[in-house]
């Protein structure tokens, strides 16, 4: 499995037909933050990662590249 966070996030957004804006709103961050993650310029903090897992009912391990979706 690919373990690069930006690639994992790109794939997740595409597979779930989510825009950066919709994803950001669902996890409580700004779209600009999601853009930075997608560009590989930043990585999510603990709270953002937790919110991703809770908002989309996906293990944080998936976003970390440890487990498959």
Task: Give the ranges of each region predicted by the language model.
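A short, Lys/Arg-rich alpha-helix, primarily the initiator
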Residues: 1-18
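Short, charged recognition helix plus adjacent turn
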Residues: 11, 36, 54, 64-69
